[in-house]
Curated annotation (Swiss-Prot):
Belongs to the DNA mismatch repair MutL/HexB family. One of its GO terms (molecular function) is mismatched DNA binding. Residues 387-396 have a biased composition (Low complexity). This protein is involved in the repair of mismatches in DNA. It is required for dam-dependent methyl-directed DNA mismatch repair. May act as a 'molecular matchmaker', a protein that promotes the formation of a stable complex between two or more DNA-binding proteins in an ATP-dependent manner without itself being part of a final effector complex. SMART domains: DNA_mis_repair (SM01340), MutL_C (SM00853). This is DNA mismatch repair protein MutL. The lineage of its organism: Bacteria, Bacillati, Bacillota, Bacilli, Bacillales. GO terms for cellular component: mismatch repair complex. It comes from Bacillus cereus (strain AH187). Residues 377-396 are annotated as: Disordered. The keyword DNA repair applies. The gene is mutL. InterPro entries: DNA_mismatch_repair_CS (IPR014762), DNA_mismatch_repair_MutL (IPR020667), DNA_mismatch_S5_2-like (IPR013507), HATPase_C_sf (IPR036890), MutL/Mlh/PMS (IPR002099), MutL/Mlh/Pms-like (IPR038973), MutL_C (IPR014790), MutL_C_dimsub (IPR042120).
Amino acid sequence: MGKIRKLDDQLSNLIAAGEVVERPASVVKELVENSIDANSTSIEIHLEEAGLSKIRIIDNGDGIAEEDCIVAFERHATSKIKDENDLFRIRTLGFRGEALPSIASVSELELITSTGDAPGTHLIIKGGDIIKQEKTASRKGTDITVQNLFFNTPARLKYMKTIHTELGNITDIVYRIAMSHPEVSLKLFHNEKKLLHTSGNGDVRQVLASIYSIQVAKKLVPIEAESLDFTIKGYVTLPEVTRASRNYMSTIVNGRYVRNFVLMKAIQQGYHTLLPVGRYPIGFLSIEMDPMLVDVNVHPAKLEVRFSKEQELLKLIEETLQAAFKKIQLIPDAGVTTKKKEKDESVQEQFQFEHAKPKEPSMPEIVLPTGMDEKQEEPQAVKQSAQLWQPPKQEWQPPQSLVREEQSWQPSTKSIIEEPIREEKSWNSNDEDFELEELEEEVQEIEEIEMNGNDLPPLYPIGQMHGTYIFAQNDKGLYMIDQHAAQERINYEYFRDKVGRVAQEVQELLVPYRIDLSLTEFLRVEEQLEELKKVGLFLEQFGHQSFIVRSHPTWFPKGQETEIIDEMMEQVVKLKKVDIKKLREEAAIMMSCKASIKANQYLTNDQIFALLEELRTTTNPYTCPHGRPILVHHSTYELEKMFKRVM
């Protein structure tokens, strides 16, 4: 008898579940996407113990016909594609036919569904085996409950994280879906506590306000562009609103949230020199294109895609963002205190894929274990020792409450997140309607950011503080200017132009400068000698592992020539292959910093006036090349309020 055998369907589904159903968040993602594909306009998501105990999804979509219910749980059974041509024209979120059988194979699942023109179907499946199938009275749509996830795969269950982490993963997914489909009303509950409610009115800015806060929504810049192949719409924050992680950038392709590093990189490039190192914007970009231009069949989770015209898309994103910022005066308002900004950022840190932290008023709420101060960050020791969820030991019983629509489900009393049990609010709750109406009004009242050019307004100097900061004024109020950052921007644009020129005016060194390298570094540099001449490095071989420099461009900062050569060489030997564009950029930034006024350097009034006038001639007078702000603004109103002239 041969050793190779065909696996049965149940074992195949268990193997597939290892890729498709990684954690509770995977289940939520797949089921909610199915609801959206079924033309749902409202979706409820109910969780217990971060989905490890129970996940319930209720929608008002098309429902599943009785004859399709069993087939839907067979592997590679789908209504979304018919032949290989459909695979290259996919508009739906799902298409592989793997999610439902994979989820059913590692859980205890109950399905109640109806198409609205016939009796509904009630189906119970445990570990991939059908336990019960019957007709039932049901409204149009689908109500699916997944309980005791991974009950038959203890190895997978063992590696589930804490309640907070798993809940954070789920909220991350739901937030992205809410942004992708603002036309769908989404409601997320955890142990009967509401975490998110979107109106479904199609206004993505309102969804962003629900997730990030109304304060962030006020700092959003609308982005819109179109080419022959792509249409881009979305919002990105002003450079003054940043976070320490890329997790706040969301990219949507044909209605599907995707994780694509090059798209995020393109967004960052659109902010070129506007962001400090290690800081990232909050952004949402929705990209529409012909399905033939994108391959979504890359990974079972469908989070990764490949583009056939990637470079054209990246260029369009970069140019669109850069064009938008050129229309705006990017002067940060000093009216928001540091404490307020720190608080707001601590709120936004909840939106990280691996962490879920306590709630601030503007964010969906996640309740801490009893006894923990809500205003304190969860200590690392607490995170590491947090109790892991344990599956219930009693025999599973299908909840009868799911059979009849009018009966409400009861939350588990064994949650490690202790909270009082409260009655679940109905969809027509007056309180919820009021909250959404209030948010809608706030979003509508947001003043659009003025796009009347980014020219720096005339500034009239009135003094200098500590030899570092310049004070100036105009009819808009008071401005504080960092003199080093201001001249750094001026010098950067000068050196950027010089480094980019092919023909270099050179000056001989009195004494040739010798550079000693290791053999590996020497060989790496030797390959790039012609390229390095383009950035002003004129190297001649001197011995087996050395180079000498006899001349340098005339525009090198005086007295710092050898130091600049050393730093440029350091950049070169770090790289396996020299990126001339990047090296030019780094060289211009480095030289602009070294050639600029330093702190504690006092200037005359004429020097200050000349500096401000020269700053106005730059293409971006608002940030230094490292992304730090050059000036901040105190409006006259803020000053009057500070001195209690207005209340």
